[in-house]
Amino acid sequence: MPKNKSHSGASRRFRVTGTGKIMRRRTNKNHLLEHKPSKRTRRLSVDVRVSPADARKIRKLLG
């Protein structure tokens, strides 16, 4: 049986750390940043962990 392909959209959006946690970027950090406070853009630049409820599904997509 051939290997399953990983979901290309999910592989761009999520990454697995060395300890197995799945990390994602925060929203609202792509464009129209001029009027957003610097404090907010700094806060949004930190990656966050995916919730455990979604982690199982994402792990399946990543293969």
UniProtKB/Swiss-Prot annotation:
InterPro entries: Ribosomal_bL35, Ribosomal_bL35-like, Ribosomal_bL35_CS, Ribosomal_bL35_sf. Belongs to the bacterial ribosomal protein bL35 family. The keyword Ribonucleoprotein applies. PANTHER family: 54S RIBOSOMAL PROTEIN BL35M, LARGE RIBOSOMAL SUBUNIT PROTEIN BL35M. The keyword Ribonucleoprotein applies. One of its GO terms (molecular function) is structural constituent of ribosome. PROSITE patterns: RIBOSOMAL_L35 (PS00936). Gene3D superfamilies: 4.10.410.60. Keywords: Ribonucleoprotein, Ribosomal protein. GO terms for cellular component: cytosolic large ribosomal subunit. GO terms for biological process: translation. This is Large ribosomal subunit protein bL35.
